[in-house]
Amino acid sequence: MRLAVGLLALASAQAALAFGLNDVAARAKQLAAKPYQAPPDTLPHELRELRYDQYREIRFKSDQAYWRRDKLPFELGFFHEGSYYDQPVKINEVSPAGAREIRFDPRLFDYGPVKLDPKHLRNLGFAGFRIHYPMNTPKYKDEVIVFLGASYFRGIGKGQVYGLSARGLAIDTALNSGEEFPRFTEFWIERPAANAKELTIYALLNSRRATGAYRFVIKPGTDTEVDVKAQLYMRENVSKLGIAPLTSMFFFGENQPASALDFRPEVHDSDGLSMLSGTGEWIWRPLTNPKRLLVSSFSTTNPGGFGLMQRDRAFSSYQEIGDRYELRPSAWVEPVGKWGAGRVELVQIPTPDETNDNVVAYWVPETPPKPQQPFNLEYRLLWQKEGDKKPGLSWVTQTRRSHGWTTKRPDERKPDDTIALVVDFEGPALAKLPPNAPVEPVFTADANGKIESIFGQPNTATGGWRVTVRLKRVDDDKPIELRGYLRSGGTGLSETWSYLLPPG
């Protein structure tokens, strides 16, 4: 009899935990069949008008972390509504007892110097949440990932600090019609077991033209991994659908020094776009802060992956004690299954300072989903530092820009009317070369660039190889596209350096 009762209890628990992606997908499908309804504007004026620095004074009380009293490995903290974050999200806990909403309570927050009318706090919700896990030391639960604002989320691995963000979906980015920002409206978070090393979250996405159901399996570690599975529904056709979008910042760097005197040599969350094409070609595109909008496309079929990377890990490159740019993660998107034909698109937007995210990268399928038809996608998102995805041969470590000169001899150098680009490569393919092995730099430019000279030489300081390209611009109002790689005896030694020299 006891066995029967035990089996019945187990079956009940399993039934309660049977909540999954299909349940959220059914909600998304129902939403897509109805006209979009914008969320009501219910945030009190005094919260909406908070400056961002004032909003940050409202802090969640860490001793009120969800699951802390239960001594579970994961804990939840929450964000208050206010300032930019003017819409609530519904957050549920999924446990053997069923799905239960975690309700907002102002007593969970310390308002510091921010004075608010208590009656305006009665009917609020949470703006988002963060997840904590003992990632760096066993005794302290670090922040691992944050879901806050539209469909944004950002994560970190061991020894990292927050940098770039990911999104659930991007619609019509960089089009004249204007971008549409879908938002996660409801979350379901599975209560973890006492020995859990991963956490599962479900999310419902909604916008004027799209709905979606998402499952995130979060695995904290040296490289924090987020396994993403989603089912999307379009209410109507979209011009451009951005899958697995990443959002970052590039203000200035080694290839584009600061326009004003600054003690920091570089300021960026990412320094390049890395891509593994369906044919196995690795491509590296250094980032820039352009004078006007730049959109670049890299077409392929069944991509191996793409990401916005922070390759430069030297503190000396940034000299920023507070922001620690060298510790900011790279984010690598690795498709699960075949994504078919499409393109990785890179959008770079002018920014006057480091407070604006001005870089976006995402996958655009060649055949967009049709309205009311399910569109399934799955990928792995890695927040990395030392384990950054790189080609097995050799890779670009830096790109520097200068005026050209008339001779290689330092004592006779004179500036000329050319542009010089200096590209350094490092990696095992170069390290294994015999001392006198021939290395050929293969570099080309489009019709707007006239290459005057290409010079390659060993970089004895790094054990790699340096290539200097001197070129002239045909039309100053147009960009120049360049490509280059290293080979020896017809065999490729490096990834492909792909550079866009902006106009002017």
From Swiss-Prot:
Keywords: Periplasm, Signal. GO terms for molecular function: carbohydrate binding; catalytic activity. InterPro entries: Gal_mutarotase_sf_dom, GH-type_carb-bd, Glucan_biosyn_MdoG/MdoD, Glucan_biosyn_MdoG_C, Ig-like_fold, Ig_E-set, MdoG_OpgG. It comes from the Bacteria. One of its GO terms (cellular component) is outer membrane-bounded periplasmic space. Pathway: Glycan metabolism; osmoregulated periplasmic glucan (OPG) biosynthesis. The keyword Protease does not apply. The keyword Signal applies. It holds the Pfam family MdoG. GO terms for biological process: beta-glucan biosynthetic process. Residues 1-15 form the signal peptide. It is found in: Periplasm. PANTHER family: GLUCANS BIOSYNTHESIS PROTEIN, GLUCANS BIOSYNTHESIS PROTEIN G. HAMAP family: MdoG_OpgG (MF_01069). Belongs to the OpgD/OpgG family. Involved in the biosynthesis of osmoregulated periplasmic glucans (OPGs). This is Glucans biosynthesis protein G. It comes from Ralstonia nicotianae (strain ATCC BAA-1114 / GMI1000).
